[in-house]
Amino acid sequence: MRKHLLCLVLTVCLLVCSGLSVCAEPAAQVAAAQTEGATSSVDMPTSAFASYTYDCWGNTIECPNPYALIRKVDGVALGVGDLKKVIDVYAKDGFIYLTANGDTEKDNALIKMDEQLNLVSDWRGYYKDGSFVPFQKPCGIFVTDEGKIYVTDTATYSVYCFAVEGEGAAAKLNLERTIGAPSTEDSSIIDEDFVERYIPSKLVVDRTDRIYVVATNVNEGIVTFNDEGKFDGFLAAGKVTIDPFTKFMKKYVYTEAQKKRIPTFVPINYNNIDLDTSGFIYSTLAASDETTVQSEIKAKKGTEQGALVRRLNMMGSDILKRDGYMPPIGDADILDTMMNKDASYEGLSQITDVSCGTYGTYALLDNNRNHIFVYNFEGYLLYAFSGPDISAGGMKTPIALTQSGEYIYALDSNSRSIFMYKQTAFAEAVMKAIQLEKDGQYSAASDVWSEVLDYDATYDLAYLGLGKTAYWKGDYETASELFKLCNNKDWYSKAWSELRKDVLARWFMPIILTILGIVVLTFVLKIVKNAKKRKEAED
C-alpha cells in the first residue's frame, strides 16, 4: 500500500512539472511572433565605424547608427576667428557654451551659441565694477538654472560667477563673485603643498549654490565650496582599507606620530564632472587600475574599485548602478581590432568627460578610440558610436561633450571644432521607450520597444524592455521567455521564481486534496480489509 501511495504522489508531481513546461510554450510563440517580420538593418546614415553595443558574453553586436554627424563648426566658420585651443562645452536651456584659450588675450573666449551652432554672444572678458577685465585662461564652464555662468580660470586659480546683462551680441558679463584657491587659513587639512598644486579645471554648482571643483594635480578628491564660496572639504576621496594587523598596531602599539603617517585616503584623480537632473554628481576618473578593470570586464560585473565613472551622493558615496551586461567603462574589448583596425587604439578606454542626459541616461567620451558611449540608468550600454573616421573629417582628439535634447555636441582639440550629432529614428525610439518606462507607462513602452525591434531585431534591450512590461503585468510566462531571448539571467530568475510561485499556488490545493484523498482512501480500504478479515474469522 505504501508503494502505491508513493507512486500516486510522484505522478501528481510530474503533472505539476509538465504544467510548467506547457505554460512556457505559448510564451515562446508570443516572443517568436514579436520578432517575426523584424529587420536587422534600416535606411540610416552610414559611418566609417559601425555603431554597436555588447551582448551578455561581451561580444560587440552592430546596431543601427543612433546619431548622425550633421554639422562641424570651428571658430572661423562661427565668425569669431581662429580658436587656438578649445577647452570645454556645456549645454543649458537650448544654448551651447564653449570656452577657449591661448597665449594672447584675444585667444581667451567664452562663446554662446544656439542649438544649431549659430553665434549668439562672443565674450573675451567681463566687467568688474564697471571696468572691462579680459579673460586670462578660461577653462571649465557651468550654467545654473537661474542663468548664472560659472567659469574656472587656470591662470588665476579662481572660479568666477557671472550674471548676463543684455541679449545677443550686445550682452555682457558682470562679475558677481570670485571664489579663490583654498588657503592654509581656510582649513587645517590644507597645507602649502596643496595650495601650490591646486589648479581649478571643471566644475558644477548644485541647487543650493554649493560648488564642486575638479582640480588638476589634486588627488584628495573633488574640492567643495559652500554657498558663500568658502572651502568646505573634499568629496569622494579614495577609501583606505586597513588590514586587521594595522588596526591592532594602531590601537595598541603605534605612537601618535606613527598613527599620523598611516594614509587617510587613497590618491584618486578625477578629470571631469557633471550634474544630473536629480542633483547627483557624475564624475570621471583620469586613471584606474588596469588589472582591476580587466578583471571586472572578465567577470562582467562592475564595482567602485574599477570604476571609470561614478555617481555620487552628497556624502560622496558612489551609487551608480552597474547592472548591465558589461561595466560602464567604455570599450570592453581591450584591443578592439574589429572596430578600429588600428593597433594605436590598444588599451582601456580613456574617459575624458561625462554628460548627463534625460531619463537617467548618461554619455561617456573616450579619447582613446574617439567613441561616445550612451548608458541607461541601470548601466546598460544603449549604443556606442563615433561617426566618420579621421580621414573623413571625424574627431581625432575629443576632449569634452554635452547634450541638449536630441543633440550631442563634442569638442575636438585637434581640429579645434565642435561636432554636432543628431539622434536618428532608432535612438529616438529607444529614448522614448526609456521615458515611458520611467513614467510607469509599461504598455506604451512595450509598443515602442516593438518598434525598436523593427529597426534592429537583435537589440537585446528591446527584449529586456518587453520582458519587463510582461513581468510588471504579471505575465511571467512571456516575461521569462523574453528574458531568455536577451540572455538576462537576473530578470529571467525573477520571472521564473514568480512563475514557479504562480504554478505552485494553482496546484497546491489539488495536490493537498489528492494526498488527503489517497490517505483517506487508504485508511478506508484498511478498515474494510480488517472488517473483512474479522468477518471471515468469525465465520
Regions found by a protein language model. Name each.
Residues 39-80, 121-133, 172-195, 230-265, ...:
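Surface-exposed loop and turn segments in beta-propeller and other repeat-based domains
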Residues 223, 283-308, 359:
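Short, conserved, GDST-rich strand-edge loop motifs in beta-rich repeat architectures
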Residues 393-434, 477, 490:
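Blade-level signature of beta-propeller repeat domains, shared across WD40, Kelch, NHL, RCC1
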Residues 462, 495-496:
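TPR alpha-solenoid repeat register
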